[in-house]
Amino acid sequence: MAKFIRNFAEKAPSMVAAAVTYSKPRLATFWHYAKVELVPPTPAEIPTAIQSVKKIIQSAKTGSFKHLTVKEAVLNGLVATEVWMWFYIGEIIGKRGIVGYDV
């Protein structure tokens, strides 16, 4: 057991250095995209989002959604699924658990 601990203690600095070297460029890429994609909407973008929602509601009322191409329908479905999943992730974080609330 002592030999294992000694070997681990000898190899740990090189393993940590390798992990840092490996993760630095990937972390920089992650932060770049996180700053771009996870930023909340600006006040100037809110009217555009409202118009988009109104357009979706209008297309549901008139039935114009039936004229979407398959590609547009798939993309709309993926966006809706992403929003739905982020809602559930927020619920899990808020509940501090996957099932049930602590009441």
Swiss-Prot record:
Its main location: mitochondrion. The modification N-acetylalanine is found at residue 2. GO terms for biological process: proton motive force-driven ATP synthesis. Keywords: Acetylation, ATP synthesis, CF(0), Hydrogen ion transport, Ion transport, Membrane, Mitochondrion, Mitochondrion inner membrane, Transport. It is found in: Mitochondrion; Mitochondrion inner membrane. InterPro entries: ATP_synth_F0_gsu_mt (IPR006808), ATP_synth_su_G_mt_met (IPR016702). The modification N6-acetyllysine is found at residues 11, 24, 35, 54. It holds the Pfam family ATP-synt_G. GO terms for cellular component: mitochondrial inner membrane; mitochondrion; proton-transporting ATP synthase complex. GO terms for molecular function: P-type proton-exporting transporter activity. Subunit g, of the mitochondrial membrane ATP synthase complex (F(1)F(0) ATP synthase or Complex V) that produces ATP from ADP in the presence of a proton gradient across the membrane which is generated by electron transport complexes of the respiratory chain. ATP synthase complex consist of a soluble F(1) head domain - the catalytic core - and a membrane F(1) domain - the membrane proton channel. These two domains are linked by a central stalk rotating inside the F(1) region and a stationary peripheral stalk. Belongs to the ATPase g subunit family. Component of the ATP synthase complex composed at least of ATP5F1A/subunit alpha, ATP5F1B/subunit beta, ATP5MC1/subunit c (homooctomer), MT-ATP6/subunit a, MT-ATP8/subunit 8, ATP5ME/subunit e, ATP5MF/subunit f, ATP5MG/subunit g, ATP5MK/subunit k, ATP5MJ/subunit j, ATP5F1C/subunit gamma, ATP5F1D/subunit delta, ATP5F1E/subunit epsilon, ATP5PF/subunit F6, ATP5PB/subunit b, ATP5PD/subunit d, ATP5PO/subunit OSCP. This is ATP synthase F(0) complex subunit g, mitochondrial. The lineage of its organism: Eukaryota, Metazoa, Chordata, Craniata, Vertebrata. The gene is Atp5mg.
